[in-house]
């Protein structure tokens, strides 16, 4: 944990600056999506107009990681357990997409949120 904290202390300012430059380069776009696993830890949420979390049940996430990344179950669970709990995202994010169905449902929910954000 100490070495990771030191690595984050060194790299976060550079990652933040590069991310902000990339976002600003898209200023003509009506929406810019910024996928950042450490958004809040890096303080990058302060340059976001809206923050969206996409959440799924724990077991669903485990099986998706195993299938996508070909990891053993223990590694998939460890990856999830290293992340903040869903309650953290529910408290911090303005919008939540519940990704507990099929892709059609996810697309429908994402499009509905897009329509809200574009108003």
Where does each model-flagged region fall?
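Switch II (G3) loop of P-loop NTPases
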Residues: 30-41
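Conserved phosphate-donor/acceptor-positioning beta-strand/loop module used by diverse small-molecule
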Residues: 33, 45-69, 97
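Alpha-helix N-capping/helix-start residues
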Residues: 1-2, 58-59, 73
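Conserved nucleotide-binding/hydrolysis micro-motifs of P-loop NTPases
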Residues: 39, 57-60, 102-103
């Amino acid at each position: 944990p100490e070495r990771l904290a030191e690595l984050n202390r060194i790299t976060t300012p550079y990652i933040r600056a590069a991310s902000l430059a990339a976002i600003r380069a898209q200023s003509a776009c009506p929406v810019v999506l910024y996928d950042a696993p450490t958004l809040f830890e890096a303080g990058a949420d302060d340059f976001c107009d809206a923050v969206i979390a996409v959440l799924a049940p724990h077991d669903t996430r485990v099986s998706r990681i195993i299938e996508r990344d070909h990891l053993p179950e223990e590694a998939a669970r460890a990856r999830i357990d290293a992340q903040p709990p869903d309650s953290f995202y529910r408290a911090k994010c303005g919008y939540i997409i519940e990704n507990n169905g099929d892709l059609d449902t996810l697309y429908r929910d994402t499009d509905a949120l897009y329509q809200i954000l574009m108003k």
